[in-house]
Amino acid sequence: MGSRTDPWSARLAKAAEQRHADGGWRQRPTLSDVAPFIDFAGNDYLGLADDPRLAEAQAEAARRLGAGAKASHLVSGHLEIHERLERRLAQLTGRPRALLFSTGYMANLGVLQALCDHHTRVFQDRLNHASLIDGARLAGATSRRFHHRDLEDLERLLARAPDDAPTLVVSDGVFSMDGDVAEVGALAATARRHGAWLMIDDAHGLGVLGEVGDGCVGRAHDRREVPVLVGTLGKALGSAGAFVAGDEALIDHLIQFARPYVYTTAQPPGVAAATLTALDVLEREPERRARLHERSADFRREAGTLGLPLTDSRTPIQPIVLGDNARVMRWAERLARAGLRVGAIRAPTVPKGEARLRITLSATHDDDALDALLEGLATCQREEAA
């Protein structure tokens, strides 16, 4: 009797061939401390990931409490240091409670899976993060996507929805590939008119926007406007993990029903300690945020004089939309040879024809770093013209 054919090998080969043909084959850059580079690709907006105070807090907590939490939060992994961090995050965002998750992706999946099912209707901005799209899909919710930041389109879709269906409106706070900011107040008003809850993922706003770094939601929009607030700890705060903030009933519900929370080992205590230190720095050193916004404005001004195709972003995320995948890769490779790391973003992360360099600014970028980036971009322009 002959062996059965292996359908998986052919399936994987076909997918790889198609991704190569589309010009979207992804590769992981392995970075070395032997060959230093200037990072304009990461999300370390306040420069805290390399701050020695965070590293020391993490090391001290690891020595005292162990390298890992050893169990999930609901078994024996929820330590006093996690409890302290949740209280601080609730305080920062002006919510009664917060709940830690291991990653931002897991937080969004956990919320949507716990709140939604096939009876639920979810309305999402078309440019929402993949974790929000995937979460609604995995929950089995009836999902519709409205045009980017188009409140009239959202209003039209909500008006057509059955009145008896639990409804959730979902949006990024700061859109990670464009750098523009959701109109949170207007979204909240639209959701309330239709009896819907609003969920905002403020991954790129927390630590950057708001009067005290509380994000584009934070204390400016209370839990009645935004019942579900998600934030991440691995971007402006420089550590790792994520959280959901809201009222008592929401957090209790997530503890009971959010499977990515229930069935995951708690984050290492050292990570929680580093995040607590980051929150101290955020509170005591507001000049970091001021410096970040100065750097973003400096880049926009100088890039504008070069005639680079900027978007309307006023955040540290500054995309240069080049359109063509091959062109984006040429520019990124040329910049890499000059010791400059930028994001080369192609479909399916962004729509086809909108490939871009995703440039992110940090409070720690000095004048020399910014000058090197601008000179590198000018060189790309000159070489292309020639």
UniProtKB/Swiss-Prot annotation:
Its EC number is 2.3.1.47. Its cofactor is pyridoxal 5'-phosphate. InterPro entries: Aminotrans_II_pyridoxalP_BS (IPR001917), Aminotransferase_I/II_large (IPR004839), AON_synthase_class-II (IPR050087), AONS_Archaea/Proteobacteria (IPR004723), AONS_Proteobacteria (IPR022834), PyrdxlP-dep_Trfase (IPR015424), PyrdxlP-dep_Trfase_major (IPR015421), PyrdxlP-dep_Trfase_small (IPR015422). Pyridoxal 5'-phosphate binds at residues 104-105, 176, 204, 232. CDD domains: KBL_like. The keyword Transferase applies. The modification N6-(pyridoxal phosphate)lysine is found at residue 235. One of its GO terms (molecular function) is pyridoxal phosphate binding. Keywords: Biotin biosynthesis, Pyridoxal phosphate, Transferase. It is an enzyme of class 2 (transferase). GO terms for biological process: biotin biosynthetic process. Signal peptide: none annotated. It catalyses: 6-carboxyhexanoyl-[ACP] + L-alanine + H(+) = (8S)-8-amino-7-oxononanoate + holo-[ACP] + CO2. The keyword GTP-binding does not apply. Pfam families: Aminotran_1_2 (PF00155). Substrate binds at residues 26, 129, 349. Pathway: Cofactor biosynthesis; biotin biosynthesis. HAMAP family: BioF_aminotrans_2. Catalyzes the decarboxylative condensation of pimeloyl-[acyl-carrier protein] and L-alanine to produce 8-amino-7-oxononanoate (AON), [acyl-carrier protein], and carbon dioxide. Homodimer. Belongs to the class-II pyridoxal-phosphate-dependent aminotransferase family. BioF subfamily. This is 8-amino-7-oxononanoate synthase. It comes from Chromohalobacter salexigens (strain ATCC BAA-138 / DSM 3043 / CIP 106854 / NCIMB 13768 / 1H11).
